[in-house]
């Protein structure tokens, strides 16, 4: 099922504590909200050229998002009230075990932390930190897209880096898996990766190594779901490495261009399609 978003190009998507889907419109400077079955509501941000990208729920009942081009981290309440904080090239963002929001600074090789309006930044080894996720060990785990590595930062700022076996892997997004490990996608190598909290890494090649996997999330079925940007497909991988792929609906003659994805309030997988829609995919057996 497709929900067309006439206001622009969806990029990031997440389910909020209010039971709605929240998404970013990267080229229009907007954040949208959709209750499944209803019409979307779009909130225009103060800066049209901010490039809102990743969005995630915070511990405070609001949604938090990054504006990569505008250099801001934003907070939006269910009623649409927006607060912005200056940050350097923020991209990935997630709530940490300490109740703070943690985010990556892609162009300055830093990890940022914001709580109660106070911003702290931690230097990480060069490599363009991109996606970030909260691990089962209370640390934050992040990808180093140009460093071909996975990083770990404790709540106190101690950093460890785990190089990937594959050169040119270019990992992007990362998520906490159902098995106590972190799972990530390698857009450059066409692989899905797994790293446990001891640093042990396993990589699973996709059937099409040119699929350019972009984002990944744990599904309600105990598997990992991921987008394949180049091929317009949705992938599913079990914790033992079995891979399935599903075609996403196209809008007219345009390819889907899937980016972010989330488990919706209805238990389905919702995918942000940059060509102007949100796709809903039923989880088999649900």
Predicted regions and their residues:
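Residue-level detector of Asp-centered blade-edge/turn motifs that repeat once per structural unit
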Residues: 15-18, 57-60, 95-98, 134-137, ...
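A short loop-to-beta-strand structural motif that recurs across blades of beta-propeller domains
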Residues: 30-32, 71-74, 109-112, 148-151, ...
């Amino acid at each position: 099922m497709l929900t067309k978003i006439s206001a622009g190009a969806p990029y990031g998507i997440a389910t909020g504590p209010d039971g709605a889907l929240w998404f970013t419109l990267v080229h229009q400077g907007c954040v949208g909200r959709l209750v499944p079955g209803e019409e979307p509501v779009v909130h225009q941000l103060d800066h049209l050229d901010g490039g809102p990208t990743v969005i995630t729920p915070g511990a405070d009942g609001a949604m938090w998002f990054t504006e990569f081009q505008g250099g801001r981290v934003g907070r939006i309440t269910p009623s649409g009230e927006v607060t912005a904080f200056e940050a350097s090239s923020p991209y990935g963002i997630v709530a940490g075990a300490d109740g703070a929001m943690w985010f990556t600074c892609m162009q300055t090789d830093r990890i940022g932390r914001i709580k109660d309006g106070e911003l702290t930044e931690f230097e990480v080894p060069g490599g363009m930190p991109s996606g970030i996720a909260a691990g089962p060990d209370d640390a934050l785990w992040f990808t180093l897209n140009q460093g071909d590595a996975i990083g770990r930062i404790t709540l106190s700022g101690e950093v460890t880096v785990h190089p990937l076996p594959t050169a040119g892997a270019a990992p992007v997004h990362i998520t906490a898996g159902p098995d106590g490990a972190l799972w990530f996608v390698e857009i450059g190598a066409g692989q899905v990766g797994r790293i446990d909290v001891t640093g042990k890494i396993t990589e699973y090649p996709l059937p099409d190594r040119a699929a350019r996997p972009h984002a990944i999330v744990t599904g309600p079925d105990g598997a990992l779901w991921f987008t394949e940007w180049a091929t317009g497909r949705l992938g599913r991988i079990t914790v033992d490495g079995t891979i399935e792929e599903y075609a996403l609906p196209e809008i007219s003659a345009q390819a889907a261009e899937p980016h972010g994805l989330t488990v919706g309030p209805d238990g389905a997988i919702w995918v942000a399609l940059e060509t102007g829609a949100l796709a809903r995919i039923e989880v088999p057996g649900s």
